């Protein structure tokens, strides 16, 4: 017992230097000690998706083709802060909707089960478009889902409903003439899937990325969801060509610029300015400031670059309008909407 006590004291002394304390497990709430195994059981029971394991392979010719294409990227895009070759090589492309760099779903602060419950009830109370009834979660490809108030919910679903609601409040996207959308850093196609499903009248949806694996799974996933013909996967090497063909009314960057170097951010902003994209929505990572600042994970400020590109801030609001919910609910951040000065 004395040896155990000594070890605990020594360990506590070490962890204190890094801002942590050792406490007895008996003092923790259940959600704080929930194990990886118990979280895994909360995933929806799904059979294997026919053909997924055969197609979603790193030696797939389509992925190899995209890698060759992306090798010609502008050098400004080749200094990622997070999505390095090593990081990408460790990402599970079969379970691309699981807990990974595309959508963090647990372990991190603000991603415990209570945060999911609080976010779900908040969405149910403020869902002006009725998207909790129009959209659903089936747990495919590894998505972590909880059964809350009669709905299977995931971070994919809840974040998407809140983002679509924000855009509708300020740009009336559900009722305005069909928009053409550019999704920068579209990942596996999370928001593309949700927006195209929620708003059938939505015009062409461009999914752009600088990571070949993202474009690969995005293309597969949106086809899997039956959205063929309503989206275009655009490699960063072809973005100017795509925007010359289809002018984008709205550009979005959701949790992507936060993981980019300033040179990469500036490269994308130059594209938006050159092609006259009128509105630009950005959602930053929390990065220690809960998304109230537009900084990347290195702490560099992106807002001056955005403003120098001719965009002015028109709306900035918390993801959850209630301060208590914003503090404790799922992955709190802020939503920013910019408009191109003098743009039409």
Segments from the language model and where they lie:
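Conserved Class I S-adenosyl-L-methionine-dependent methyltransferase catalytic core
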Residues: 68-174
């Amino acid at each position: 017992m004395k040896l155990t006590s000594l070890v605990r004291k020594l360990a506590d002394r070490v962890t204190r230097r890094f801002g942590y304390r050792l406490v007895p497990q008996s003092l923790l709430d259940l959600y704080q000690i929930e194990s990886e195994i118990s979280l895994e059981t909360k995933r929806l029971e799904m059979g294997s998706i026919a053909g997924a394991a055969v197609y979603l392979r790193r030696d797939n010719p389509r992925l190899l083709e995209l890698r060759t294409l992306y090798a010609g990227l502008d050098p400004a895009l080749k200094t990622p802060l997070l999505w390095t070759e090593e990081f990408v090589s460790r990402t599970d492309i079969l379970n691309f909707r699981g807990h990974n760099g595309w959508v963090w779903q647990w372990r991190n602060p603000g991603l415990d089960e209570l945060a999911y419950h609080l976010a779900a009830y908040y969405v149910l109370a403020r869902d002006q478009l009725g998207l909790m009834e129009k959209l659903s979660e089936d747990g495919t490809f590894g998505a972590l889902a909880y059964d809350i108030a009669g709905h299977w919910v995931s971070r994919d679903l809840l974040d998407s409903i809140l983002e679509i609601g924000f855009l509708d409040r300020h740009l009336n996207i559900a009722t305005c003439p069909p928009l053409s959308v550019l999704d920068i850093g579209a990942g596996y196609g999370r928001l593309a899937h949700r927006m195209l499903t929620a708003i059938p009248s939505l015009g062409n949806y461009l999914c752009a990325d600088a990571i070949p694996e993202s474009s690969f799974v995005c293309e597969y996933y949106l086809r899997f969801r039956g959205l063929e013909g309503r989206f275009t996967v655009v490699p960063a090497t072809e973005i100017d060509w795509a925007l010359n063909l289809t002018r984008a009314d709205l550009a979005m960057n959701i949790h992507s610029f936060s993981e980019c170097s300033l040179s990469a951010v500036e490269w994308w902003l130059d594209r938006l300015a050159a092609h006259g994209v009128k509105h630009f929505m950005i959602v930053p990572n929390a990065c220690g400031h809960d998304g109230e600042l537009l900084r990347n994970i290195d702490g560099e400020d992106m807002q001056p670059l955005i403003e120098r590109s001719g965009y002015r801030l028109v709306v900035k609001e918390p993801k959850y309008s209630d301060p208590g919910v914003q503090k404790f609910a799922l992955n709190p951040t802020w939503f920013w909407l910019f408009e191109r000065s003098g743009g039409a």
